[in-house]
UniProtKB/Swiss-Prot annotation:
Subcellular location as annotated: Plastid
GO molecular function terms attached to this record: small ribosomal subunit rRNA binding; structural constituent of ribosome
Cellular component annotations (GO), alphabetically ordered: mitochondrial small ribosomal subunit; plastid
GO biological process: translation
Annotated family: Belongs to the bacterial ribosomal protein bS18 family.
Protein name in the entry: Small ribosomal subunit protein bS18c
Gene3D superfamilies documented for this protein: Ribosomal protein S18
Primary residence: plastid
InterPro entries (UniProt xref): Ribosomal_bS18, Ribosomal_bS18_CS, Ribosomal_bS18_sf
UniProt KW Magnesium keyword: no
Keyword Ribonucleoprotein on entry: yes
């Protein structure tokens, strides 16, 4: 057969299916922190169902469980460490100059 008349045959590449993120034995519950924390980003945001290949029902259950765990303070709302205070710093009054015009405009009775 001539090379130009030969039908195009696509090579079959083998691919590996991804394992589901939630196994059938896993229970989606707000108390199961080890399972829930896998579906949060580094900032503490809930990852989309497209990222973890959830079904719509699984995504709703995970979202509700994360929100319940946050309300019950089992999980933090954010995972940022910038808000933690390491040491107390003395406050200075030199941060903002006082506006003298405001004081002069007040009427005395």
């Amino acid at each position: 057969m001539d090379k130009s008349k030969r039908p195009f045959i696509k090579s079959k590449r083998s691919f590996r299916r991804r394992l589901p993120p939630i196994k059938s034995g896993d229970r989606i519950d707000y108390r199961n922190i080890s399972l829930i924390s896998r579906f949060l980003s580094e900032q503490g945001k809930i990852l989309s169902k497209r990222v973890h290949r959830f079904t719509l029902k699984q995504q709703r259950l995970i979202t509700l469980a994360i929100k319940q765990a946050r309300i019950l303070s089992l999980l933090p709302f954010t995972k940022r460490k910038g808000f933690e205070r390491s040491e107390s710093t003395p406050r200075t009054n030199a941060l903002k100059p006082r506006n003298k015009n405001k004081q002069n405009n007040q009427t005395q009775f």
